[in-house]
């Protein structure tokens, strides 16, 4: 039980302190990558959706 509580606390701390990380700006040298960085968090969802499309293509065997 104690291990689960420790894990929850660690996750909460990470979520609280990393939230400011998501809103930081890229350095000027990498400013041209802003559009790519904005799309990157959505890429795993495309793979998730691709799994359903693939299963539909093979009739959910």
Swiss-Prot record:
It comes from the Eukaryota. Keywords: Chloroplast, Membrane, Photosynthesis, Photosystem II, Plastid, Reaction center, Thylakoid, Transmembrane, Transmembrane helix. SUPFAM superfamilies: Photosystem II reaction center protein K, PsbK (SSF161037). InterPro entries: PSII_PsbK, PSII_PsbK_sf. The keyword Transmembrane applies. The keyword ATP-binding does not apply. It is found in: Plastid, Chloroplast thylakoid membrane. It holds the Pfam family PsbK. The chain crosses the membrane at residues 40-60. Residues 1-24 form a propeptide. GO terms for cellular component: chloroplast thylakoid membrane; photosystem II reaction center. One of its GO terms (biological process) is photosynthesis. It is a single-pass membrane protein. Belongs to the PsbK family. PSII is composed of 1 copy each of membrane proteins PsbA, PsbB, PsbC, PsbD, PsbE, PsbF, PsbH, PsbI, PsbJ, PsbK, PsbL, PsbM, PsbT, PsbX, PsbY, PsbZ, Psb30/Ycf12, at least 3 peripheral proteins of the oxygen-evolving complex and a large number of cofactors. It forms dimeric complexes. One of the components of the core complex of photosystem II (PSII). PSII is a light-driven water:plastoquinone oxidoreductase that uses light energy to abstract electrons from H(2)O, generating O(2) and a proton gradient subsequently used for ATP formation. It consists of a core antenna complex that captures photons, and an electron transfer chain that converts photonic excitation into a charge separation. This is Photosystem II reaction center protein K. It comes from Populus alba (White poplar). The gene is psbK.
């Amino acid at each position: 039980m104690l291990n689960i509580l420790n894990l929850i606390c660690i996750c909460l701390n990470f979520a609280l302190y990393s939230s400011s990380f998501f809103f930081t700006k890229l350095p000027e040298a990498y400013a041209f990558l802003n559009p790519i960085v904005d799309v990157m968090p959505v890429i795993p969802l495309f793979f998730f959706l691709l799994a359903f499309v693939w299963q539909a293509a093979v009739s959910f065997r």
